[in-house]
Amino acid sequence: MRGRSYTPSPPRGYGRRGRSPSPRGRYGGRSRDLPTSLLVRNLRHDCRQEDLRKSFEQFGPVKDIYLPRDYYTGDPRGFGFVQFMDPADAADAKHHMDGYLLLGRELTVVFAEENRKKPTEMRARERGGGRFRDRRRTPPRYYSRSRSPPPRRGRSRSRSGDYYSPPPRRHHPRSISPREERYDGRRSYSRSPASDGSRGRSLTPVRGKSRSLSPSPRRSISRSPRRSRSPSPKRNRSVSPRRSISRSPRRSRSPRRSRRSYTPEPARSRSQSPHGGQYDEDRSPSQ
């Protein structure tokens, strides 16, 4: 039964055996895909390529060693790349050299993400990296530039905000005062309300506060300007001309028409009846 239970395994193993002829390294996978370059960190700035070559050639032939430097200053960055000919040698060197003391510093050795490239390509990377760094550094510059626009943004927001909201409230009474001057139509009153307008300007925020706090100041504040401003011109204009206009035509029309209508009627009646008698009496003695 055990022999029969293992019969299906050979086809599975056969598929695996079909992959086995491909070259493989010690740590599995194809040797072509395995990394051959190591990234060595925590190097001293005075470390040279010869120092790394002596310590890493113990594990196999070294193809290339590269110590990158800063593109702008030329100072070493404190790490380097060691590339081996065989990926197995690179794996042994990583295993033994990780934590190794070189020139008084403990090294950290890991596989590089990509195999070591030419120095020209690395320089191009450095330039590109510098650009990327500049781009990374530029956001603070943009932020610094954006520090100047915040007043703009603040202004746009402050129009609806609290900091710049009082000026428009102050401007409203200013716009109302000339309107009141227009309605009054008198320049003499336009100057005197200037003081009242200044009081009104001081009172306008109080009105806003009184509206939010209590309804009583509304009545006291709203009635005082209405009594002082509105009735004075209305009484002068409406009462005086109406009385003068209404009384004069009514008196002139009604009594005059009545006198004229009633006076000539008796005159005509008297003149018609006695005219004959008078003329007869006058004629009689004259003749």
Swiss-Prot record:
Domain called RRM: residue spans: 36-114
Pfam families linked to this entry: RRM_1
PTM note: Phosphorylated by AFC2.
Residue spans of biased composition, Basic residues class: 220-237, 244-260
Source organism, top-level taxon: Eukaryota
Key words of the record: Cytoplasm, mRNA processing, mRNA splicing, Nucleus, Phosphoprotein, RNA-binding, Spliceosome
Additional facts recorded: The splicing pattern of the pre-mRNA is regulated in a tissue-specific manner and by development, and changes in response to various types of abiotic stresses and hormones.
Similarity comment: family membership: Belongs to the splicing factor SR family. SCL subfamily.
Protein name: Serine/arginine-rich SC35-like splicing factor SCL33
Organism encoding this protein: Arabidopsis thaliana
Taxon lineage: Eukaryota, Viridiplantae, Streptophyta, Embryophyta, Tracheophyta
